[in-house]
Amino acid sequence: MSSAADFDPKPRRASIAVDVGGVIVGGGAPIVVQSMTNTDTADIDSTVAQVAALHRAGSELVRITVDRDESAAAVPKIRERLLRLGMDVPLIGDFHYIGHKLLADHPDCAAALAKYRINPGNVGFKDKKDKQFAEIIEMAIRYDKPVRIGVNWGSLDQDLLTALMDQNAAAGSPLSARQVTREAIVQSALLSAALAEEIGLPRNRIILSAKVSQVQDLIAVNSMLAERSNHALHLGLTEAGMGSKGIVASAAAMGFVLQHGIGDTIRVSLTPEPNGDRTREVQVAQEILQVMGFRQFVPVVAACPGCGRTTSTVFQELAQNIQNDIRKNMPVWREKYPGVEALNVAVMGCIVNGPGESKHADIGISLPGTGETPAAPVFIDGKKALTLRGPNIAADFEALVVDYIEKRFGQRTAAE
């Protein structure tokens, strides 16, 4: 019979630590959140603004497209502008097709980037493939930069895939085309990493990723990579999609892999709504890591879903207000109140689970449900502290939350 301990997360897979502009990826370091801009990198103002927004939202690494001379020329200026804003956020250059040429022609760009991302499926073709791949690796060695070898199934090395398909067709028990494609993705990453090491790039300068669009494929290829190498791994779907579908797909895929100890950095590739907020993908990535217990970024607000006992919307509005206040104040609170991200707040709507859930939180309130006495007990550190009554229960509880934060986490600052 299984014990409760059997269902805890598996120990983190041992991977080699890679320093990306001062942010450690792998080697047991906290799982890193990263994101990518969707601006024209040559538009310096727009790119600086979006990188800054992503970084403020919590993105620890930000990737930018470097697709032509104008983009490459803009990179050192973007880096300089960000530093003037007090943002020493590592920038990752996303290269396809002509990365070797852009890095050679723009040495200031090569120096300003914290990492190069290359795709072995389009770094070059036929006779030029290994040569152009080697040129990028040599630039990484020259400037002492790490490289992410990022394989995408949408741009998979067709020569490798064809060879594996031919071998499979001749096998006694052939695999499905989907299974062969998974194998090709994994082999592309591993063969490219081996070639990079042969050229002279140290293993602690290599991160691998294998990106696909389907949840089961992401689970499979990353599990295979984890078994066959100790390189740091970057997790993410190639394109998760829009809205709730993208969030659910990302959480399902990465949640399973992370639970098995696999993954050193994640990116949630949400398709934003037209004129939508790009920082949403950062928030979702943080929430995946936080709800699974791997990292803490912001205080947790637990609230019941509501039922026939909670016809009032007061508890919903209160939970939303507290969540909004937390998001708004976190940039200041993070500096002013170290450890505040570990706070747990409960806002419950009736007597059934309200008191119990509130006791489990650092501070919680059990609001009256339909037909219940119009009083709301407040629990602090597991004990009933007081009961709120009257028309200002919500405002009074919000004030109590702020007071609790100041007293509990402000004392740490004073002690330090």
Curated annotation (Swiss-Prot):
GO annotation terms (biological process): isopentenyl diphosphate biosynthetic process, methylerythritol 4-phosphate pathway; terpenoid biosynthetic process
Keywords, comma-separated and alphabetical: 4Fe-4S, Iron, Iron-sulfur, Isoprene biosynthesis, Metal-binding, Oxidoreductase
InterPro entries to which the protein is assigned, alphabetical: Dihydropteroate_synth-like_sf, IspG_bac, IspG_bac-typ, NO2/SO3_Rdtase_4Fe4S_sf
Reaction(s) the record says it catalyses: (2E)-4-hydroxy-3-methylbut-2-enyl diphosphate + oxidized [flavodoxin] + H2O + 2 H(+) = 2-C-methyl-D-erythritol 2,4-cyclic diphosphate + reduced [flavodoxin]
Pathway as given in its UniProt record: Isoprenoid biosynthesis; isopentenyl diphosphate biosynthesis via DXP pathway; isopentenyl diphosphate from 1-deoxy-D-xylulose 5-phosphate: step 5/6
Pfam family, one: GcpE
Cofactor binding comment, as recorded: Binds 1 [4Fe-4S] cluster.
EC number: 1.17.7.3
Molecular function via GO: 4 iron, 4 sulfur cluster binding; 4-hydroxy-3-methylbut-2-en-1-yl diphosphate synthase activity (ferredoxin); 4-hydroxy-3-methylbut-2-enyl-diphosphate synthase activity (flavodoxin); iron ion binding
Cofactor(s) named in the record: [4Fe-4S] cluster
Broad class of enzyme this protein falls into: oxidoreductase
UniProt-annotated binding residues for [4Fe-4S] cluster: 304, 307, 350, 357
Annotated Gene3D superfamilies: Dihydropteroate synthase-like (3.20.20.20), Sulfite Reductase Hemoprotein, domain 1 (3.30.413.10)
Family: Belongs to the IspG family.
Role summary: Converts 2C-methyl-D-erythritol 2,4-cyclodiphosphate (ME-2,4cPP) into 1-hydroxy-2-methyl-2-(E)-butenyl 4-diphosphate.
Protein name: 4-hydroxy-3-methylbut-2-en-1-yl diphosphate synthase (flavodoxin)
